[in-house]
Amino acid sequence: MARWPAPPPPPPPPPPLAAPPPPGASAKGPPARKLLFMCTLSLSVTYLCYSLLGGSGSLQFPLALQESPGAAAEPPPSPPPPSLLPTPVRLGAPSQPPAPPPLDNASHGEPPEPPEQPAAPGTDGWGLPSGGGGAQDAWLRTPLAPSEMITAQSALPEREAQESSTTDEDLAGRRAANGSSERGGAVSTPDYGEKKLPQALIIGVKKGGTRALLEAIRVHPDVRAVGVEPHFFDRNYEKGLEWYRNVMPKTLDGQITMEKTPSYFVTNEAPKRIHSMAKDIKLIVVVRNPVTRAISDYTQTLSKKPEIPTFEVLAFKNRTLGLIDASWSAIRIGIYALHLENWLQYFPLSQILFVSGERLIVDPAGEMAKVQDFLGLKRVVTEKHFYFNKTKGFPCLKKPEDSSAPRCLGKSKGRTHPRIDPDVIHRLRKFYKPFNLMFYQMTGQDFQWEQEEGDK
């Protein structure tokens, strides 16, 4: 068995100081020992330098040291340009994909790309509309990793829906506006804008001509009105003003919101409730001869309930004594002075316009001129918008810009009244006369209901 060679003997101790060599002897030490010391020192220093460089992780050996001895040595690779270096990532910051390397156009004989231009005004770095700053917009303007981009794109529609003020109704209204359609003889305003509480109300009276007035005023382009009767101040007041506002149509700046509910005029709580909503609101009352109004009211009820008693029976508490039953709604509504007194406790007379139901039939353009002046509107609705229907005895609306047939009120308007005993009509005239005169004095208008020829 081979044996390991014995370790070399320890170096001899340094020689003691000796006396100077005798004359004629050499001053140099042994050459072998000096050469060994220099080689050992050189290797130790070289090893120490490579160890220090290798521990830093930045040591790259030249290719000449890795290739075969016969290969030509190549210079070390040049450091990459700054655009190719990975972006430093800060701990806790969202990861971002490295920017793609720029095309080296110069190497292909092309001019270099111009510097990146700033985003267009109103957009962010992604070409998305800018919301005007804030954390959310800064988040959207931050370049995202592919996985984060999916999340951002899925969340973007929800963000846009929350910030956008355009609704489906607005878009539908704009599409309708492009067609500039008209419905029912009235100009159809596009269904976008803002829902507002009304600035004017048609508060009465039932069977006085309120529907005819509403349909005529809706022809005006600066008026938007509810087609149905909301009955907010008498039946639905507990639902609140927001419910009432949502019932209203959308209006643009400069347009007036209106509604009509004839029962307001005879509702005791209505004046106070309306005043609490808007002190400066404008009120319109269409009044009619109370006798013919009562007969028309009864005729409407009779068409729905044929089994009710006759008009003569319902109008009197005691016909023999000639006692009129003022508690019957058909009679009570016609006591205009009594109801107006309640309204004047909350509104000045200057905020109330009284329209004659009789003149609205024979001269609709004249009465509509008063209404438009009262509302502060330009006189757009004129005689060219009306056509008198001799069969019904009522004016009908027409569109002056085309040749379509005039639009008349429903079949219930102009229905034949039942024949009423002339004695009952005479007694009713006597009953209403003092109230009518009081009403004339309160309003400053003489409606001339006491003339015999005015009662039919």
From Swiss-Prot:
Query: GO molecular-function annotation terms?
Result: [heparan sulfate]-glucosamine 3-sulfotransferase activity
Quick one: where's region Disordered? 1-31, 68-139, 154-192
Bridged cysteine pairs (disulfide): C396-C408
Q: Which reaction does it catalyse?
A: alpha-D-glucosaminyl-[heparan sulfate](n) + 3'-phosphoadenylyl sulfate = 3-sulfo-alpha-D-glucosaminyl-[heparan sulfate](n) + adenosine 3',5'-bisphosphate + H(+)
Under InterPro entries, the record lists:
NST/OST (IPR037359), P-loop_NTPase (IPR027417), Sulfotransferase_dom (IPR000863)
Its GO CC terms are: Golgi membrane
- For this UniProt entry, which segments traverse the membrane? 35-59
The membrane-topology field of this record reads: Single-pass type II membrane protein
Q: Does the keyword rRNA-binding apply?
A: no
State the PANTHER family in the record: HEPARAN SULFATE GLUCOSAMINE 3-O-SULFOTRANSFERASE 4, HEPARAN SULFATE SULFOTRANSFERASE
Q: Per its record, how is this protein called by name?
A: Heparan sulfate glucosamine 3-O-sulfotransferase 4
